[in-house]
C-alpha cells in the first residue's frame, strides 16, 4: 500500500484555539458531520429525528451525531464534537462516537486533484476509496437476503469492526469481519446490528426500522472527502463507523494520539479497508 495515514481532526482544526486556527474547509462546510447507517449499526449514538442534520442535507442521510477528535480535554479524556457541532468531552473508554477520518498522503493528493468537484458552500470534494455506508432499500433487502440463501458471489474483500458493545467498559477490541458480496455489479455487506441501546429500534436512511441483532444489507460505495488544500489532506464528509474505543479506561489520555487504541484501529484495519479497491499501479503511473 502506498504512503497513507489516517488520523482524526484536532480541536483546533475544528473550532480554532490559541494553538491552531480553524481549517478553512471546516469554516465553509460547517463543523457538524452526518453519519452513515454503518455508524448506527456499529453502535453510534443516533438522534432519531431530523432536527439534527448538516446544513447540506436535511434528509435521513444528513442526520448528525457525535464524533471523535484526537485532542485531549485536559482531564484525561477526549474532546468530541456533538450532534449540534458543540465542543464537549467524552470518556476515553466509550464507543458510541463516530470515526470521521482525515487522510494524509503526500503522493495521493496530487494524483486525485484532477477528480475534484465543487461541493457545498465553496468547498471542493473528491471520491476516493470505498466503504460500507448506507442500507439498501427495503425491496433490495429482501432480494439480497434471498440471493444470500441461494449463494452469492464474494468479491474477496472484507471489512473489520469491533463487536463489543458500548456498555462493556472492560473488554478491549474484539474484531468482527464481514465479507463483501456482489449483486448486479454492486457490492454489499450483511452486518448484524450492534446498536448503542439494546432493545430499541432505529430507523435507518432507507426509512425502515431495525432492532439489535437484525441482519442488514449495507451498500459499499465511494467515500466522499472534503479537500483541505492548506494541509494537503482529505477529510471524510461523514462519520464512517462507530463502536471503536478510544483508549483503555486504565490509561489516562494526555494527547498522545499515536499510542491510542483508536490510532491502532485506523492503522491496522480502517486504512486497509477503505482503500482495498484502489488501483495503486494506476495511481503511480
PLM regions with names:
Residues 1-285:
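Collagenous Gly-X-Y triple-helix signature in extracellular proteins
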